[in-house]
Amino acid sequence: MSTPNEPEKPGIIDAFKSLKMSDFAHMVHHPCFKESLITSVVCGLGVGCIHLFLRAPISRAANWGFGTYFGMSIVSWEGCNYRKQLETNNFNIKITEAAEKTPKHRSSRSAQEIDEGFNE
């Protein structure tokens, strides 16, 4: 519980209230959206069909298919975001290492001294 001096922490209802339709419209441009959607749909259909082939009732097979779709979409989304984060971190490390290897002063002589050396 918060004291009178502390602001209240936003809850899950506040998070849902802050969502806009434009947030969902731009979701398809997220790099992990396509991979997550395809993986979850294929897994959900696969598990649902397997349950149908095993002579489960249609409602139970649909429940298993939807549950698998929902679970795999979360797992795939988080896995993709984790891989993207690792790639970004590795890229930043390589940039830092390359910047450290580049000499700050390539030559202690001025450009004019270098040109005079070639003309001799």
From Swiss-Prot:
GO process terms (BP): mitochondrial cytochrome c oxidase assembly
Topology relative to the membrane: Single-pass membrane protein
Main subcellular location of this protein, as a coarse class: mitochondrion
Subcellular location: Mitochondrion inner membrane
Domain of life per record: Eukaryota
GO cellular component labels: mitochondrial inner membrane; mitochondrion
Mitochondrial matrix domain ranges by topology: 55-120
Membrane-spanning parts: 37-54
Alphabetic keyword roster: Membrane, Mitochondrion, Mitochondrion inner membrane, Transit peptide, Transmembrane, Transmembrane helix
Cysteines engaged in disulfide bonds, as pairs: none
Region: Disordered, residue numbers: 98-120
Record PANTHER family: CYTOCHROME C OXIDASE ASSEMBLY PROTEIN COX20, MITOCHONDRIAL (PTHR31586:SF1), CYTOCHROME C OXIDASE PROTEIN 20 (PTHR31586)
Protein task: Involved in the assembly of the cytochrome oxidase complex. Required for the maturation and subsequent assembly of the mitochondrially encoded cox2, the precursor of subunit 2 of cytochrome oxidase.
Protein family according to the UniProt entry: Belongs to the COX20 family.
Descriptive protein name: Cytochrome c oxidase assembly protein cox20, mitochondrial
Organism: Schizosaccharomyces pombe (strain 972 / ATCC 24843)
Gene: cox20
